[in-house]
Amino acid sequence: MMYVSARSGSAKRSISSLPHLSQRFKQTENEIVQMFSVPNHEESEKPQEKWKLSRKDPSVRMLDERFIRIVKIFKWGPDAEKALEVLKLKVDHRLVRSILEIDVEINVKIQFFKWAGKRRNFQHDCSTYMTLIRCLEEARLYGEMYRTIQEVVRNTYVSVSPAVLSELVKALGRAKMVSKALSVFYQAKGRKCKPTSSTYNSVILMLMQEGQHEKVHEVYTEMCNEGDCFPDTITYSALISSYEKLGRNDSAIRLFDEMKDNCMQPTEKIYTTLLGIYFKVGKVEKALDLFEEMKRAGCSPTVYTYTELIKGLGKAGRVDEAYGFYKDMLRDGLTPDVVFLNNLMNILGKVGRVEELTNVFSEMGMWRCTPTVVSYNTVIKALFESKAHVSEVSSWFDKMKADSVSPSEFTYSILIDGYCKTNRVEKALLLLEEMDEKGFPPCPAAYCSLINALGKAKRYEAANELFKELKENFGNVSSRVYAVMIKHFGKCGKLSEAVDLFNEMKNQGSGPDVYAYNALMSGMVKAGMINEANSLLRKMEENGCRADINSHNIILNGFARTGVPRRAIEMFETIKHSGIKPDGVTYNTLLGCFAHAGMFEEAARMMREMKDKGFEYDAITYSSILDAVGNVDHEKDDVSSF
């Protein structure tokens, strides 16, 4: 085959990448030079001067193209190495960076980098190492990237600047190699690389991203101890966010004040974080004052700020103010996003303002916000809670699917719970089957709602069947589901089954909670086992499970039903001395006990106490008192007639 110069455009190449032409042909050094020479006669006469030219000089660009052609055709191996040697081109840092930036396989770049490092009178510097590190990160070769970074920090000829160290930390952070990033950081410090605020910020932000908030505080303390390295706005923003996530609200507020004392202007993000903290600790007025301070400081609130604002006001029950801020935000020219609108709908739904909620939903399109599964869940939940007709709820569910929004596990849970509470158990059971068909995992909340509804409908066998199914599919069942099942076993007189479930809970290790104890005590009282129920109450508190008012009311009701007021009065005094406030059920239970026992003076005294405490008489209890008084009057009339 005839070998021709690369300048002959119409001639066939002497080298082919096709498999049947992959055999290497012996070439002279002159032929290789001819193939990749620059079409510039003057420059070819001065090969030693070409690297002194400006980066913008066309000849330099052409020189780079020769290397690119060699690497692309030969890949890497003896041919490529020989071609580079024959061309007698000087390998310098700019050339290495250029070759690493071209579009060739990562393995070619790695091999070229190693080859260049072995050249006489050449050593890699920080710029060539960093170029390779970026290539390795892009190729997701994180192990090779870390080994290269280790070379950088250990190489005595390479000077690692604070800016380079920041980039190394960020690269390892993005690769989720946090411990290795910290190791590199401290190795570089040991080599007298003095980190700046920016370097420390890179470490802090990496730790934050991985949720290592306690470590953030340690790095901040170390930074302050440097003496001449001071926190900046980025540092304060990261620290305040970390403290907020750790629940160290006082520390976050202190840092905010410290920042202002140091004449630093808080950012929108910092103000927004502080707003959330004040609302979380119940300091609503302080949060509103901070919002006004933010505006006075010339820091414009963002949609995230307004989201935090309406969430906090909604939680505090100040819904009108939250809705007012929505209108203010629109007047200020800010466009709400889907997260803001979902939060606003949630606030309106919780207080039953369904019409306004649906209006906000209909406005989403105007703001170019596509309703999400959260949007639909919020509407459906609000409709159930406002006692809307089931057909209206079903129409929203149909609309959701028509809009190609896939229902979530929570959607089904809301619907199943709502249908159960509206006595549409069969519809709820069909939805449970639909969940299974769609591949959703067993949802304990949905099962709990169904088990409870079936129990109320006295379909105890069906409830027990679902309970067993949940245990088989889900493994460990929540205490709340156990409590529901124990309650229904007690109601239908299957106390031994209820006790077995209670003991099963104890064997699981988590231990029964207050709901489970209350359910079993209620079953015992129903079965006339009042003393056993009272013993269980004492055992419950001995086991570290704090009784609530319902626990005491169950026992009080048991004593009241026995017709022995003394024990009921003792329980009432126990409740008051335990620090738990009696409720309306407590007073009405004792009042009924007094009425049945004919203790009218005590009943009258109890009624006055109830009135002082703001409790109303139960209609049934009040009627029984009147009946009892009437019976006494009849008895007196009968006696006087003799």
From Swiss-Prot:
Biological processes per GO annotation: Group II intron splicing; mitochondrial respiratory chain complex I assembly; mitochondrial RNA processing
UniProt-listed PROSITE patterns: PPR
GO cellular component labels: mitochondrion
Pfam families: PPR (PF01535), PPR_2 (PF13041)
PPR repeat placement: 125-159, 161-195, 196-230, 232-266, 267-301, 302-336, 337-371, 372-407, 408-442, 443-473, 478-512, 513-547, 548-582, 583-617
Organism domain of life: Eukaryota
Entry keywords, A to Z: Repeat
Coiled coil regions, renumbered to chain: none
Record-linked InterPro entries: Pentatricopeptide_rpt, TPR-like_helical_dom_sf
Family: Belongs to the PPR family. P subfamily.
Protein name: Pentatricopeptide repeat-containing protein At3g16010
Organism for this UniProt entry: Arabidopsis thaliana
